[in-house]
Amino acid sequence: MHGSSKSIFGKIRDSRYATRYIVGDGIDIGAGPDSIAQYYELFPLMKSCRSWDMPDGDAELMGSIKDNTFDFVHSSHCLEHMRNPSIAFDNWLRILKPGGYMICLIPDEDLYEQGEFPSTFNPDHKHTFTIHKRKSWSQNSINLFDLLSNANYSIEIKKIELLDATFRYDFNRYIQKSRFDQTLTPVGECAIEFVIKKLLT
């Protein structure tokens, strides 16, 4: 999937990532082989970025990490694997310093799952996500607006964006298939990205 790498082009075009969001000491939760840290030259104010994956512990609890540890928290396509994304989200905020930023990417349920759940493209997905809907076809759907508004910390929303610039809406018809995982292609994105700031109170 390489969601972090695919999102780099958008981050380059927005100076806030290099000057505000990805600054200081951070952690990339669920980084796998595609950590944001590999693009260190694009984020010159980033001092360090720890990669966190399954061998490091439960990403939902982040139990070994103290409160208010990191200047930024980055995560690409990890929240959908959590048993309880609300608990995970609050713990990710817990380890973020006040004034720090969380940059998170999650799959959009319509573009990625394409109307079927449990996921046929990634069976470990436990939830689907949408920016906001009155009603979803997925019984496990989470509205991002609801997740953010129910956080146990004070936050400021800096950005919410559907990353669909390289998603080809007519591709299934073109290749004559009913469904296809476009993240298998080198450029295909079908994600939601949100950036939030943890406030002091």
Description of each model-found segment:
Residues 1-68, 72, 161-175, 186-201:
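Conserved N-terminal segment of class I S-adenosyl-L-methionine
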Residues 21, 86-93, 101-201:
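S-adenosyl-L-methionine-dependent methyltransferase catalytic module, highlighting the catalytic core
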Residues 37, 83, 112:
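Glycine/Thr-rich phosphate-binding loops of Rossmann-like dinucleotide-binding domains
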Residues 82-83, 96-97:
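Helix-to-beta-strand junctions that scaffold the AdoMet/dcAdoMet cofactor pocket
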